[in-house]
Amino acid sequence: VVLKDMTQEAAEKGKAYSEPLLKKLVSRGKMLQSDSEKILNRITATSSDTDLQGCDLIIEAVFENLDLKHTITKNTESYLSNDGIWGSNTSTLPISELANAASKPDKFIGIHFFSPVDKMPLVEIIVGEKTDEETLAKAFDYAQQIRKTPIVVNDSLGFFTSRTFGTYLDEGLHLLVEGYNPIQIDNMGKAIGMPVGPLQVGDEVSLELTRKAQETWADMGVADKWSDGSVTRRVIKDMITDNGLSLIHISEPTRHVD
């Protein structure tokens, strides 16, 4: 596995994230120390694109910016093996538009992981207009090999999960600005069967990622296409100005749910 980042320091930090996860497995008797060391030794941290030469799968995972993702695709797609495929870990951007930057759009597919990746089993696989069946099969097989649960969806802005959770977050923030207790808002979300509340979703996804996605949607002329994100944008603007506090601790409630 090649882990490539902007700097060597950032790449090493990414590799180091795996160490405590493996140590926990060893301490619980679920993995031998020797196997843990073998896994870490398989990860090559680098800041050089050339180390990607010959990869069977490259997964790009930068933030939600169409131009940036296009640039990365153009600069590094050529390092794939002859039968290699390109995966974009995008949560919102249409795969068919991202694939416009690829020389082989039939080998381009969305592979959307969820945070924290080591705990969340779901992987959303998004098929673009030109994605061929072999690429879909490889992406699906890869997800199963790493013990994830893949779901296959067609290409659309936000796909299935981001459209659902985006609306969920929007509604939670509407309640927040109306003065409801943040803890009660999240408890209401869990009461209807969601694993976490909408404000916790916002915190875990991060306001910065949501902000960048909102900006990209506005640039594409599709902001508020499936829900009213005006309140979300206002809250994010205020929160980032206010040093990035947690949504759950944003303010004192003025209203309560009976």
Give the ranges of each region predicted by the language model:
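N-terminal glycine-rich phosphate-binding loop for ADP-containing cofactors
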Residues: 1-251, 255
